[in-house]
């Protein structure tokens, strides 16, 4: 057995909230064989398996009695290419932003709007991560996952993944599928998405009227760095709540009471609201209770000022949820996975 299983390991370095909880058992998977060994170990020792990547979409409310398996596999390769596009495959443990930069350096466009998002390649499809008008589903080709029930590998197409807003089949069947590697369809001819105002504005400020994918990536990195705190400095998991999608009738009611609300009509007739706007209107921006708080510049981000526990952060999130329901009749859904 090559898998190294350790006991009583602090997970503080492995979650971006910096919550100091302990894993009963911990191991890192650098290969498919390591993953299979971890599954076998969990069965043999009758212990559940918790798979993590970069820990950037995770809120740990207490010590974890599972075998925590951190995906640490690395590798980026082009598996198909022609004059217009390439299919790039990356191992699940590849850090996301460096992967995006590697693709840009290869002259491949499509991922630039997803620059500086924390996490790993394997976690990206689970959430169907998205930013500035682009989601994973827009550049996704296929992925390979291990069926934890049978031990067999399965290939997933775009349709198989059932991608939705910050959603996929893997989020609902997390105990079954373990993503090993992901393939992306990227273009050699850039089709830039500049419809989000801040991106265009930043490019204008830089005097760039004919941007390249690299330019877009740099602009988005600058915007994100200003808007979102660095987890290495201030513990956080990025946007903590999903932007709610509500019935048009409820939106009309809110609009009547709060004329400043901005809604984004959806294809199904519903309207998407900015969760950050709701939270800010309710007075939570900059709120702090001990070391758990809401960021002073970005109300969508909960932060750990140092020694907050996962339970304290969770309780704060629930208080915000209750207040938003009471004020607006809107339910906010948390983005991070709770354990």
Swiss-Prot record:
A GO cellular component term found in this entry reads: cytosol
Catalytic residue positions: 166, 239, 335
Name the cofactor(s) required for activity, per the record: FAD
Q: In which pathway does it act?
A: Cell wall biogenesis; peptidoglycan biosynthesis
Bilayer-spanning residue ranges: none
Task: Enumerate the UniProt keywords alphabetically.
Answer: Cell cycle, Cell division, Cell shape, Cell wall biogenesis/degradation, Cytoplasm, FAD, Flavoprotein, NADP, Oxidoreductase, Peptidoglycan synthesis
A GO biological process held by the record? cell division
User: What is its subcellular localisation?
Assistant: Cytoplasm
Q: Name one GO molecular function term.
A: FAD binding
Task: State the reactions this protein catalyses.
Answer: UDP-N-acetyl-alpha-D-muramate + NADP(+) = UDP-N-acetyl-3-O-(1-carboxyvinyl)-alpha-D-glucosamine + NADPH + H(+)
One Pfam match: MurB_C
Question: What does this gene product do?
Answer: Cell wall formation.
NCBIfam families membership: murB, PRK00046.1, PRK13903.1
Q: Which family does it belong to?
A: Belongs to the MurB family.
Q: What is this protein called?
A: UDP-N-acetylenolpyruvoylglucosamine reductase
| Record organism | Pseudomonas savastanoi pv. phaseolicola (strain 1448A / Race 6)
């Amino acid at each position: 057995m090559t898998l190294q299983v350790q006991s009583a390991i602090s997970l503080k370095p492995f979650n971006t909230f910096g919550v100091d909880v302990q894993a009963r058992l911990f191991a890192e998977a650098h290969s498919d064989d390591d993953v299979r060994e971890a599954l076998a170990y969990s069965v043999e020792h009758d212990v559940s398996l918790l798979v993590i990547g970069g820990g950037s979409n995770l809120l740990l409310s207490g010590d974890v009695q599972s075998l925590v398996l951190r995906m640490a596999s690395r590798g980026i390769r082009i598996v198909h290419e022609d004059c217009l596009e390439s299919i790039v495959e990356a191992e699940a443990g590849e850090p996301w932003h460096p992967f995006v930069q590697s693709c840009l350096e290869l002259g491949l466009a499509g991922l630039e709007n997803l620059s500086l998002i924390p996490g790993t390649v394997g976690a990206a499809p689970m959430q169907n991560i998205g930013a500035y008008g682009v989601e994973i589903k827009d550049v996704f080709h296929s992925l390979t996952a291990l069926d934890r029930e049978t031990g067999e590998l399965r290939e997933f197409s775009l349709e198989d993944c059932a991608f939705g807003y910050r959603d996929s089949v893997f989020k609902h069947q997390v105990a079954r599928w373990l993503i090993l590697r992901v393939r992306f369809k990227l273009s050699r001819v850039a089709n830039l998405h500049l419809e989000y105002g801040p991106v265009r504005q930043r490019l204008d400020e830089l005097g760039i009227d004919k941007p390249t994918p690299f330019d877009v990536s740099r602009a988005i990195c600058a915007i994100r760095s200003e808007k979102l705190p660095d987890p290495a400095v201030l513990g956080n998991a990025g946007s903590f709540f999903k932007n709610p999608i509500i019935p048009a009738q409820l939106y009309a009611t809110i609009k009547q009471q709060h004329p400043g609300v901005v809604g984004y009509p959806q294809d199904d007739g519903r309207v998407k609201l900015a969760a950050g706007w709701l939270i800010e209107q309710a007075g939570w921006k900059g709120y702090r209770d001990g070391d758990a708080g809401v960021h002073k510049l970005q109300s969508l981000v909960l932060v750990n000022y140092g020694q907050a526990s996962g339970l304290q952060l969770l309780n704060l999130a629930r208080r915000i949820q209750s207040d938003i329901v009471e004020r607006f009749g809107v339910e906010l859904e948390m983005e991070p996975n709770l354990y």
